[in-house]
Regions:
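Bacterial N-terminal signal peptides that target proteins for export
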Residues: 2-12
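Repetitive helical segments and hydrophobic/amphipathic motifs
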Residues: 16-18
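C-terminal motif of bacterial Sec signal peptides marking the signal peptidase cleavage site
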Residues: 21-22
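Hydrophobic single-pass membrane-insertion segments
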Residues: 26-27, 74
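Short, low-complexity, disordered segments immediately C-terminal to signal peptides
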Residues: 27-41
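Intrinsically disordered, low-complexity repeat and linker tracts
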Residues: 45-57
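C-terminal, surface-exposed recognition/capping segments
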Residues: 58-61, 67, 72-245
Length: 245
């Protein structure tokens, strides 16, 4: 799939701080496990092409909450960031703080099965992180949380994705059914103490555990396409918080 590079222009420089306006408190349950394939992404996700205009505006919600016409509202920037093009902090899955080294030996969840994680009160019966283990909830308050696998898939299936630049940072402008948009920067991921693929890929945790091995679901994208796939829990990834409508 051919994608044209686009330069994004920010509409505002509003700082992203915790705002609870318009947010509910109910957590969504997890549906059956399914992996998004490349063909599905190409069929249901509109990506920028040669007919797109040269410069696009990226809308930023004044309350730092963007209602894109989906099942949940999305934050305008990553957890720990003050602008939408910043990566914020990187987290291992089920952990609450950034760290200098991301590996299996110091991971709080990597070595455990989902059954064990339920017993340790890390996840619920739907394999979703409990609020006490959800970094977005702990950092921003009870109305915020990490997106589920289903919500990440909804973001892919129902939104228009356009690869380009915002303030010199590569990433995707994601526009919802109602025309509202967010920007997801391509800021890579941590393995060990090394940051990989910055400006090449975006790597975002969901709150949903994968039922095979030491993995959980993540929203990953490159210039080619976005997808939801399993990833080792010990790796450091960005988090884009959501809240209920």
């Amino acid at each position: 799939m051919k994608v044209k590079m686009i330069k994004f222009k920010a509409v505002s420089s509003v700082l992203c701080v915790a705002s609870l306006i318009g947010c509910g408190e109910t957590r969504n349950s997890n549906a059956d496990i399914e992996k998004i394939t490349a063909s599905l992404a190409e069929q249901q996700c509109a990506v920028a092409n040669d007919n797109m205009v040269e410069t696009l505006n990226v809308e930023e919600d004044g309350f730092n909450i963007v209602d894109m016409g989906l099942s949940v509202k999305w934050a305008s920037c990553n957890l720990g960031a003050s602008k939408s093009e910043q990566p914020g902090n990187y987290y291992a899955w089920g952990e609450l703080n950034k760290k200098a080294n991301y590996n299996a030996n110091n991971s709080a969840t990597y070595s455990y099965s989902l059954t064990e994680l339920r017993s340790k009160k890390v996840i619920d019966s739907n394999n979703i992180l409990l609020p006490t283990k959800d970094a977005a909830t702990i950092k921003l308050g009870k109305n915020w949380r990490m997106p589920t696998r289903e919500e990440a898939e909804e973001l892919i299936k129902k939104c228009k994705w356009e690869w380009g630049l915002k303030n010199g940072v590569k990433g995707y402008k994601v526009t919802g059914p109602n025309g509202k948009s967010i920007f997801l920067p391509a800021k890579g991921y941590f393995f060990g103490s090394q940051l990989y693929d910055t400006d090449e890929t975006g790597n975002y945790w969901t709150s949903t555990g994968y039922d095979n091995g030491n993995f959980s679901y993540a929203l990953d994208f490159s210039r080619r396409r976005p997808k939801v796939a399993s990833s080792g829990r010990s790796g450091g990834r960005c988090i884009r918080p959501v809240c209920e409508k």
